């Protein structure tokens, strides 16, 4: 399987991870990193952050230990700005704003958003209607909690389209419609901005959806 390399630097690469590929610490993680290393003809690559198995889009892989340490610092200091796109067929309680609250483990591997704010997950978002019963969400996480965006969307009453863990009636949906579309950060005094549009999934390629994604890219939303 060929992994799409979206951006290449002497210290790191950014790939477009396909939906359905796990990067967590199981047997598949080693497979992903080994596959990329083999493709690049390098001894090893370092995973410096994660995407859920159901999420597609931009993923940074360091090419040396020093770069991995630098990215660890950047992520811990919240200096890497991430933007995600999501789709939902449910109307949200509010169309834009801030979703904030502590996250607590629920049943069957799921998480839930709490009213408390001791160590909260924070997400800025905006949304726009693509067509009846289909809405595009632009999500900007300010923290990096497990399942943060999926839980945030559920808390709005708009679970992500196709999300079998947090939504309902997902059997006929071909994927979970969450995509990491943009990364922006300073790396050793160089500003890096990478954008990757979603293409994997029947709803991403709908003209009404693609049009609204293009509008977002050319006309800044409040949270951008």
From Swiss-Prot:
One of its GO terms (molecular function) is pseudouridine synthase activity. Keywords: Isomerase. Its EC number is 5.4.99.-. It catalyses: a uridine in RNA = a pseudouridine in RNA. Disulfide bonds: none annotated. GO terms for biological process: enzyme-directed rRNA pseudouridine synthesis. The active site is at 52. The keyword Isomerase applies. It comes from the Bacteria. Belongs to the pseudouridine synthase RluA family. This is Uncharacterized RNA pseudouridine synthase HI_0042. It comes from Haemophilus influenzae (strain ATCC 51907 / DSM 11121 / KW20 / Rd). The lineage of its organism: Bacteria, Pseudomonadati, Pseudomonadota, Gammaproteobacteria, Pasteurellales.
